Amino acid sequence: MAEGIDRKMDDRMEFTTSADVTVAPTFQDMHLKENLLRGIYAYGYESPSAVQSRAIVQICKGRDTIAQAQSGTGKTATFSISMLQVIDTAVRETQALVLSPTRELATQIQSVVMALGDYMNVQCHACIGGTNVGEDIRKLDYGQHIVSGTPGRVADMIRRRNLRTRHIKMLVLDEADELLNRGFREQIYDVYRYLPPATQVVVVSATLPYDVLDMTTKFMTDPVRILVKRDELTLEGLKQYFIAVEKEDWKFDTLCDLYDTLTITQAVIFCNTRRKVDWLTDKMREANFTVSSMHGEMPQKERDSIMQDFRQGNSRVLISTDVWARGIDVQQVSLVINYDLPVNRENYIHRIGRSGRFGRKGVAINFVTSEDVRILRDIELYYSTQIDEMPMNVADLLT
């Protein structure tokens, strides 16, 4: 099913766009392939979101594009529709490549592409670490129109010559702020070096700090910019609160007191380290609370199974590191708890954007010790938002 985009928020979003960007009010106005239109409508979209109505036509024209919009505004479908429009399915070669910072996000993009391209006979493969290399090789040798992957595995497949790059027309960097941070920067350059010189580059993210925009000058030519103004970056419709916790040790008791509230729908609890995730999961289970947990060092099969259980509602409380924060779409999540405030303020919007997806009610609760007050104030200033102390009736806000 498509993201049910929050139209009220969408209508109020302010965009700073390059002068020649027009707005396409309907998908028909974008002159898309008939079978792609069928897939878009079957997926549940009726009309384009604000970012879709601005970015899709520009990307389809072949322009390098920087698109920034909040979580839950249809960013994934923006570049998925664009890729499906420009590829030639008669040519069984990789023509579009998407790089994402996490395996889960890369897999989710693959499923969106397959759903939107349902009537096009499109081949799309998720090329991610932690999976069988032999399966990657088999799929890539068969021929994939679109590859969605994580930078390390994609670079490896290109070096092995199993992922052939000579037909690639478009490179998409999703959650570009995270991708271009130190951890992935070199791998991105590794991949980019192998691409044809005329490859179009599309950069998509909820946050685009200046250093990222600066970096894009190295591999983009005269890009179209579709940027949400900073002041519009508060996730409208989400209620944000803090709970003052005198010391770190007391966070656990506070969380136990909140457990009944957490399970009204589904909740995600964020910690900053995998060690903290494991510790908190064990402590919660010892206290007879049902929780599941996930972090980047778990085997991929285990991560997939945990994600599936959570998506299906079999588990209701998930404890995770930031591996889960970026772009993962689970419709029923109404509550996010920052057990630890994020080290990087850019990640705050990615974390709390997991709750109240697409116009549903959502609540974010931040546990704040005296050492955290400065970080909380910094987040408030950065996003021009106000985070109030949590009221007693928080359960009522979720129902």
From Swiss-Prot:
Enzyme nomenclature, EC number: 3.6.4.13
SMART domains reported in the protein's UniProt record: DEXDc, HELICc
Catalytic activity: ATP + H2O = ADP + phosphate + H(+)
Residue ranges of the motif Q motif: 25-53
Keyword terms: ATP-binding, Helicase, Hydrolase, Nucleotide-binding, Nucleus, Ribosome biogenesis, RNA-binding, rRNA processing
Domain Helicase C-terminal: 237-398
InterPro entries in the cross-refs: DEAD/DEAH_box_helicase_dom, Helicase_ATP-bd, Helicase_C-like, P-loop_NTPase, RNA-helicase_DEAD-box_CS, RNA_helicase_DEAD_Q_motif
Pfam family for this entry, one: DEAD
GO biological process: rRNA processing
Description of its domains: The Q motif is unique to and characteristic of the DEAD box family of RNA helicases and controls ATP binding and hydrolysis.
Stated family: Belongs to the DEAD box helicase family. DDX48/FAL1 subfamily.
Name the UniProt record assigns to this protein: ATP-dependent RNA helicase fal1
Gene behind this protein: fal1
